[in-house]
Amino acid sequence: MVKSISHVVKRPGRVFGDPDVEIPVAEDLTTTPGIPLREADVSFFSRVEPLETQNIEKGADRDWVWSVYSPEVADYMRGHDERMKPLVDSAEVSANLKPSGASRNGKDLTEDIRRAARELGFGEVGFTRFDRRYLFECKRSWAKFPHAICLAMEQDYDQTQSLPSLEAEHAHFDTYEFESKRGAKLADLIREMGYHAQIHSPRDPISVMIPMFVAAGLGQLGANGQLLSPHFGSRARLMMITTDAPVTYDKPVDYGIHAFCQKCLICVERCPARALVKDKVWWRGAEKNKVIYDRCRPVMAIYEGCGICMKVCPIQKFGMPAVMNHYVQTGEVLGKGTHELEGYSLHDKGYFGPGRLPNFERSFFDIPHGRREDWLFEQFKERIAGEDIPTDGELTEFARNVKSAIDKNGITRDT
Ligand code: SF4
Ligand code: SF4
């Protein structure tokens, strides 16, 4: 049954030079531009429970994953970290680089920068206020400039459809390496225009990024916890540049995703870990489907980064224009129930088509939790709950480990 259309969103084509596309949003998918927010709650939580980088907040499991990576994944990740290090190092000092050209007397540079970013290969480019409420606590002093340029780079289509696989991990992390170099070029261009440009590496961000991408109109949050961008859904890798260049902010857009996900729910139904939840909740001031991190993490670590929730998303596979047109024409979710969209394989468990999920023992989900030092204390509590009193040597060893964990938090990076 053909649906009534509420509005049509016009967006630039997938790559620079492509014609604009139109995305029809059905009336029954209309909610709000961006994401439903309770601004007072976002501000409150940022003050009393500031966000922290996963490498500190989830430090215990970030160390643990290295013990379960396959040799191939571990080798590739070590190589990636080495290749990224100079890029992350240069991003860290980029705020202090002086503009190299004369400023253009306050001329609005939004479209100059957008065009340059598109020419460099970024598929989605948007501008918004750098919202300090999403800063990580340990990087509070890093943010120097008021405007955020949100940049999304598409990762390879074919490699992504093989998720979960080492090949798909290449698509993921190779894109980080490529876009970091392109981001550095864009920052150089902004300095030549006479302004500062601070790079926020995709491997060492200073804040949560998705809320600012949504504010800049580059997509909406999907039930899989990822940004669904118009052309490639969550098959995009995100980075930001902050600047003091004069720019005009874009506005959040209602693509219909907030409501569409509740009709689709493919990612929720196909997640092997049952880590995605059907019902939206209010979380730190935003209404969303909240991922259960502790269920996702072991599957991600053991099955090559998993990413099944990305692979099975119709927006990722077919793009938003095709999916929304299909919904308007039929009232159905394009590809739902098909092996092509929903099927996947896990290396030791085989193939799972629509309606079939793997099972795991309860112990599979018993992994280290929380910060490194908190996990050490948890283990210590268990140790002294037994009958034995620790020896002086064990106490010294425990203190050394806690000190080392705390020191690591001070120097840690999201690499
Ligand atoms: S990465 Fe895998 S385990 Fe984690 S939420 Fe997505 S589908 Fe589920
Ligand atoms: S799979 Fe469906 S429910 Fe999940 S993010 Fe994609 S569109 Fe939303």
Residue map of PLM features:
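Residue-identity detector for threonine
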Residues: 30-32, 53, 110, 128, ...
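Catalytic cores of enzyme domains
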Residues: 103, 114, 123-335
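Short, structured coil/loop segments at alpha-helix boundaries
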Residues: 70-73, 107, 254, 338, ...
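Compositionally biased, intrinsically disordered low-complexity regions
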Residues: 15, 19, 36, 128, ...
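Arginine residue identity/basic-tract feature
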Residues: 11-14, 38, 47, 62, ...
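Flanking helices and flexible, charged tails adjoining ferredoxin-like Fe-S electron-transfer domains
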Residues: 1-31, 282-415
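Non-catalytic, usually N-terminal nucleic-acid engagement modules in DNA/RNA processing proteins
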Residues: 1-165
